[in-house]
Amino acid sequence: MAVPALWPWGVHLLMSLLSLGSGLDTLEVCPSLDIRSEVTELRRLENCSVVEGHLQILLMFAATGEDFRGLSFPRLTQVTDYLLLFRVYGLESLRDLFPNLTVIRGTRLFLGYALIIFEMPHLRDVGLPSLGAVLRGAVRVEKNQELCHLSTIDWGLLQPAPGTNHIVGNKLGEECADVCPGVLGAAGEPCSRTTFSGRTDYRCWTSSHCQKVCPCPRGMACTAGGDCCHSECLGGCSQPEDPRACVACRHLYFQGVCLRACPPGTYQYESWRCVTAELCAHLREVPGLATTFGIYEGSCLAQCPPGFTRNGSSIFCHKCEGLCPKECKVGTKTIDSVQATQDLVGCTHVEGNLILNLRQGYNLEPELQRNLGLVETITGFLKIKHSFALVTLGFFKNLKLIRGDSMVDGNYTLYVLDNQNLQQLGSWVTAGLTIPVGKIYFAFNPRLCLEHIYQLEEVTGTRGRQSKAEINPRTNGDRAACQTRTLRFVFNLTEEDRILLRWERYEPLEARDLLSFIVYYKESPFQNATEHVGPDACGTQSWNLLDVELPLSRTQEPGVTLAPLKPWTQYAVFVRAITLTTAEDSPHQGAQSPIVYLRTLPAAPTVPQDVISTSNSSSHLLVRWKPPVQRNGNITYYLVLWQRLAEDGDLYINDYCHRGLRLPTSSHDTRFDREDPALEAEPEQGCCPCQHSPPGQALPALEAQEVTFQKKFENFLHHAITIPKAPWKVTSINKNPQRDSERHRREAGLLRLGKNNSDFEIQEDKVPRERAILSGLRHFTEYRIDIHACNHAAHTVGCSAATFVFARTMPHREADGIPGKVAWKAAGKSSVTLHWLEPPDPNGLILKYEIKYRRLGEEATVLCVSRLRYAKVGGVHLALLPPGNYSAKVRATSLAGNGSWTDGVTFYITDLEEEDTGGMRIFLTVTPVGFMLLVTLAALGFFYSRKRNSTLYTSVNPEYFSASHMYVPDEWEVPREQIAIIRELGQGSFGMVYEGLARGLEAGEESTPVALKTVNELASARERVEFLKEASVMKAFKCHHVVRLLGVVSQGQPTLVIMELMTRGDLKSHLRSLRPEAENNPGLPQPALSDMIQMAGEIADGMAYLAAKKFVHRDLAARNCMVSQDFTVKIGDFGMTRDVYETDYYRKGGKGLLPVRWMAPESLKDGIFTTHSDVWSFGVVLWEIVTLAEQPYQGLSNEQVLKFVMDGGVLEELENCPIQLQELMRLCWQHSPRLRPTFVHILDRIQDELRPSFRLCSFYYSPECQRGQASLLPTEAEPDSPPTLNGASDYSAPNGGPGH
């Protein structure tokens, strides 16, 4: 590998070492940084050499590109965890921000990722030229709509396992100009080439920064000159084989030296550096809190590992005997939320008092047990009050002692007051809780039965310490049925969505004590429900309840109807009597039934979910779906119905020789790539089965990881900022947008009532699983497939409604072949008719035919024949053919694409002499008469031409024509006093151009911003007349895409021409300003493909207007197109910018200046300028747009360009150029002028890609253009003229003829 290729990134390495002073000796370590909202927050990175932890830069919505200019942190070389960028507006590249970032270690990852770039709306390239290693973790680059230069990065040079990277949803590669330095003739050596993912290419981060590739053994770093560094260096070094000269260390760093292991007396910290025991003892994970760091097995850890603890003042971790004790000093701690318990995690000994006041919350018990479950001792008191969210105190599962060093009100060690939903005390009784001093107090706990409290008295040894008032039987358990009688259900009836119940009458001792009944019910798939389901009292996982009034008659049995319920669902149900206790000393009594389990009847299922389809052959479709959300029974089978759909007959109406066609594709869903091979159908006879790698077990894991990442990332965003979530989008299986409207009409009706499909039989099948293989289908045909879910009760309740999908089988390879041979028949002088048969069973519809014919010794010509044209004669009529021997072959184009060519057929066109040997005598007789007639016609034509040319506008550059008549003021004259000059805009070919204001120029406007073109004060009278005459040419033009003339000031000096103001200047300057390295870059993104096509359409529209006006431009180039404030491109300046770009012109043989790099070959050879030559120039303008205004034919002198083009040369194809634009250039650069398209034809090809506003203001859609095109079309009766490229006849508008 050539060493010079290292220099582009070697400069960055040298800058990195210089910015770090003496290498690793001056490292400044910063903790994890979360930088958000304000760009100024980035200043926290100012002195950081290493971010020990993660670096997150996110949520800067108000930032602009200007905010990041001049902002750079060259000292930063390492991030030990991960680097995350998310929604930072205005940031276009990281190359200036982190020019020397060398290593991302990935010690801790963001769910497996070390580098995450997510939803960065303005980022154009990653731009980390110094990055040499991502030691652990994958890379995730996703949803960055402007991000390019991803295909030029070899991630294998940075990561040990790049296969898990996730790089999706960024700018399409074909829309990016991913060109590396030195590749397109730029100065210096090109970047190194490597092979990654099976593709060998140049490797770079940006168009000016190569990716560093060291010539050393894999994994070793190197110096800027290519010498190998020490094996412990990572990312680069300043001296070879010196562990003190590394940019970063491969393993460990200590006192400026890179080492494989820490020296004796030091300990590894954060997997990258060594620290002493003293430094480890002073480290703090959270500033301000006591250190918990310990040394374990040669590493300094934030906490001792599980089962180990620090003993006394020692920093070393020792193994615990049993549960590791952890003492937590809390004073008096009030716990009013789960978060308040987090600092008690792992505590076994709480020194102080705990007060629980949990008024609200959901599902608290698991979190409380996780945080408080290890507490064994509370030295003070435990007070639980107003905790309405608590149902049980079982989360204190290890609590053994409440010592009572301090007590509530001086008396109470355990104080439980006003907990409306507390029902159980948990495992305190069985665990043997001890309260050595003080009393216990229970009051206003209406659901806590007294027997639980009395048991606690016995266990804790507090019986007899407290009075009856301190455990009040009237306020504890008064709303719980602590002593109950059993109720029995006497009747039940189940239906699909309801259950009817009746139970026996209940009569308490006092009839007035019975108030009502409450029926509790809930879904219970298993028969394991308990009365106390759900860990809290806030409704989570709790029972549904229904209040039932007492029956009016005492002899009537109470009952209830539970509705609405889900079909075929098991419910747990019990009923409880609500009673009062009126007797003074009697315990609260009640009645309750046992829990019974009832199942509702089945019903029809809901529709199957997520149906997808693919085709693996021309006769098979594979369909897969998911079960219905509500099965409403046991699914026994699925009913699958399918029907062939008729092709859209309207396709025959269009002429696809002149109109583009978006072909439908056979159905394929990438989700099928993960399915099992059992779904694969038998291959077609004569075809080899495709070889697939056996599905590995890693795919489900990767899929699960993907789901987990998305969830975790959304959780992170939820905590970062509240962002409204977009509604779910409904996506269609259909891959063919042209058929959307038709498909929606079909979907509106039922399958069996399809209007256009009644001729095709509906077929059906029953399948037991969520998949089906449909066989015996017609090739490349669309089918509608309906799936119904049927359960075990389908015979009574029916199957589900249908879910459906449209799918198309694959094409048959030979179906579009033309049967038999092509026949021919002479059809008169210089003409022949070719006949052939249509394919009997094509792939869909036959839309057109292509005939490739050639005369012996000449290039082949391709003629396109629409199906309608073919149908008239069963072939095609070729006319105006020169005499000679010909060969021809035909192929058909169907909905699936092109078929195969037929065998060639030969025919001949006879010479006139062969047809009529007596023709020579007639010729000799009439020649003198014909000669005199031709002389007369030539004379008349000469005088007519002189008269016609007096109104023909051709060239507009001063060197192209001579001055004639003096200028006469007319209605375009504007008084000089109405004009005010504001500032200079630049130099034109006649003089300075100014920005100004014109008063009263347009109706309703007080003043109008204008461009003012002037002529030099020293200009001659001839030059002033030329200046005004050139402006007069534009008086006849009125087109939105041609710069408008607004007026002339010819009286007095200086002479002024008033033009429409184009604030963004000429197109060439505008394109060059969009280059990333441009000093005058306005902060706009580089043009996307849609922007390029819009520019091309606007220029073509202006040129089509000029062609319709019989105007030949002769100098079409980006420099002569202007850009308005809203980025509309217009034909303008008409040669007035020539002096500004004088190097674009060349003086040939003492003649005027010529723009040879934009000129057609016929213009260079013979001086012929027509609309066809303007089309050639238009192709060069397209090339300028794609390359951001590079000079055409770079590396060739003007003389060389002249010879190159005249010898048949054209500009080379651009790498990464969009295919659509490359095809347009190829059409424009046909060496035969008649083979080039007209500007209207160009617009025909791209009209569907232009913005809707184009239709409102363009010449192309104007009635004038439509009338002009109609007058140029040949009639159906005319014979076929010699075809141009792609079969389109030459319909170019009449031009002004040759220019000189």
From Swiss-Prot:
It catalyses: L-tyrosyl-[protein] + ATP = O-phospho-L-tyrosyl-[protein] + ADP + H(+). Gene3D superfamilies: Hormone Receptor, Insulin-like Growth Factor Receptor 1, Chain A, domain 2, Immunoglobulins, Phosphorylase Kinase, domain 1, Receptor L-domain, Transferase(Phosphotransferase) domain 1. It is a single-pass type I membrane protein. Disulfide bonds join C214-C222, C216-C228, C229-C237, C233-C246, C249-C258, C262-C274, C280-C300, C304-C317, C320-C324, C657-C864. It is an enzyme of class 2 (transferase). Residues 1273-1300 are annotated as: Disordered. One of its GO terms (biological process) is male sex determination. It is found in: Membrane. The modification Phosphotyrosine is found at Y1145, Y1146. One of its GO terms (cellular component) is receptor complex. Its EC number is 2.7.10.1. Disruption phenotype: Renal function is impaired, with reduced ability of the collecting duct to adapt to alkalosis. ATP binds at L985, G986, Q987, G988, S989, F990, G991, M992, V993, K1013. Glycans are attached at N47, N100, N311, N411, N492, N528, N616, N634, N756, N885, N898. Residues 1-26 form the signal peptide. One of its GO terms (molecular function) is phosphatidylinositol 3-kinase binding. Residues 979-1254 form the Protein kinase domain. Belongs to the protein kinase superfamily. Tyr protein kinase family. Insulin receptor subfamily. This is Insulin receptor-related protein. It comes from Mus musculus (Mouse).
